[in-house]
């Protein structure tokens, strides 16, 4: 895996500059935003653009500022959306996407898919409505579907596996796998739990939240420290750990150091605008 500038997929695989002649990368993720809990001075809140051959562009989470960042990389009218949960920093740029899909001069044809927790339609409809107590019916622009824990969802050439994780609201980690076996696991927001380790088992890339530094006084079932993110990566035997969801008030350097103390593979804290190519290891 390597980071480099994004370019348009056009349904093709990517030559990987760091692996060898003829090797291709089939999954590409661009960090639209990675600031934890709130929009940061240098990054929107959570949002990640995922592209793969024979698959429509997907956005994992849609927090504050993500719609603006998305416009630098893809047509917002072309994307489908996968929401891990409905806390504001993961979904509240969605009303802006409602406006884009309804009122752009070249309005998108058909509906986009929107996957999320059970009350996605009601919660986002309330946020988008101009009147208190009313729901903006988004069924004209989105086909809203709900995650079911452990039930895989095919999207284009990819398979998405949602698993409930430990967070105060209904929250899912997602495992995305392509036909070659390349796998990305996104933790969403979670505290330490067995489901997260199970979901991440053997993943090529583990995009994992690390919202704070480690302390025994941290509340359970809310977020991970750098120590806990690194420990989960080690327990799951992932190939590479990408840390995300670090709030502006948390030291990135301390979180990275904590994770490295627990996990001996590559560790990197992502920044907005980075692009990563993901590939399964070559099989002998």
UniProtKB/Swiss-Prot annotation:
InterPro entries: cyc_nuc_deg_phdiest, Metallo-B-lactamas, RibonucZ/Hydroxyglut_hydro
Domain of life: Bacteria
Gene Ontology MF terms: 3'-tRNA processing endoribonuclease activity
Coiled-coil segments: none
Family annotation (Gene3D superfamilies): Ribonuclease Z/Hydroxyacylglutathione hydrolase-like
Similarity annotation: Belongs to the AtsA family.
Name this polypeptide is given: Uncharacterized protein ML1173
Provenance organism: Mycobacterium leprae (strain TN)
